C-alpha cells in the first residue's frame, strides 16, 4: 500500500516541472543544498511537517531531504494544497497526505499520518509547523511523543501566538524557534508576499476591477500593510481598521483613513481581514453591506469572518465556482465570500511567489538545523525550562544575503574604521537585536 494520499498521482509530471521552475526563484534553499548537502546536518532528524503543500513547499521538503532528514508531510489548510505539487512529492517517495478541498475530518486524518510511520521506532523527533495544529495534536493528544520531540520551528503569526500562549500556561514541553519573527520572514513574506498574492487571489476568483473601489482592510500588521499597499496601487480607496494605536497611527501616516468597520460597511466594495483574530466581520455587518460586496480573509484560520452565520441565515447560497460563494441576504442583497473565509491567496490562487517563500523557507531549514544540531547540549532545554527562541541575527542576515545576487543587488563593504565607529563587526551582524526594521 502506498504511503501517501493525494488527489491524483498522475499530476506528478506536471508538478515536477513546476517545482523545477520554482527552484530557479528560490536561491536561498538551493544554496543551502550546496553548502550543507555534503555534511548532512539533518541526518537522523525525523520531521513531521504541517505546512501548505504548494510547489514552493515541495522545494523546502526536498531541501530537508537533501540535508539528511526523514520527512512526512500534511497541509495546514484544507484548501491550500496544489495537487500537482503533492503528487510530485509523493512520487519522489515522500509520504505526503494532502489534497485541495479536504473536509475537516480528512484534514485531521492527514495531520495524524505525519506522527507515525517513520523509520526506526516509527515516531517523529522534530516538528515543522504552520499555524500550530500539528504542535497542538502532539502535545495535547499524543503525550507519548513529547519526550521524543527535540524542537519545533513555527512558520506563521498564528502559530507563534499559540506557542507563547502555551508557554504562558506552562504547557510547552519542548523548545521552539519562532521563524515568523525573523526579519527575513515577517518583513518579506508577510508584507511583500501578501502585497502580490492577495490581489492575485481576488482577481482569479472574481475578475473584479479594483480601481475606484472602496476597500476595507481589517488589521495593519505586516500582512495588512502589504494588502493595503496592493489595493492602493491598483487604484482603490483603502480604509484600515485597527485596535493598536501604533499601527493605526502608521496607517494614518501612510495616508489611509482609519475607521471602524461600522463606518464603512455600507460603502465598501471589498473587505479583507488580516488580523489572525476572530469575529472581525460579523452578523452585525453583513446585512448593511452593499449588493455583491466581496468578503475575504488572508489570516491563517477561518475565524475572522462569521461564515457559519452566513450559511445559517442566508436565504440562498450559490457556489459560483470552487471557493467563490454568493449568499442572498433577507434584504435581497448579496455577499460574495471567497475561499469560504480561509486564506484567499491560497484558496483562490497559488499563494506567495517563489522568491519571497525562499526567504521564509531558508529560515525554516536553518531553524531545523539549529534545533537538531543542539539537541543534546542543553541549548534548547525541555520541560519547565523550555522556551520560544529566535534565529540569531547573523543567520537572519545570511538569509537576506543569499537572495541579493538574484535581484542584482551589491553590498557596500564597511571599512574597519567605519565598523569601529558604529561598533559592529566588519561583516556583521550589522544591527542589534532590538533594532526594528
From Swiss-Prot:
Chain ranges passing through the membrane = none
Some GO term, biological process aspect, for this entry: which one? one-carbon metabolic process
Q: How does it assemble?
A: Homotetramer.
Lineage here is:
Eukaryota, Discoba, Euglenozoa, Kinetoplastea, Metakinetoplastina
What is the protein's species of origin?
A: Leishmania donovani
Recall the GO molecular function terms of this protein's record.
Answer: adenosylhomocysteinase activity
Cofactor comment: Binds 1 NAD(+) per subunit.
Question: Does the keyword Coiled coil feature in the UniProt annotation?
Answer: no
Q: What is this protein called?
A: Adenosylhomocysteinase
User: One GO term of the cellular component aspect?
Assistant: cytosol
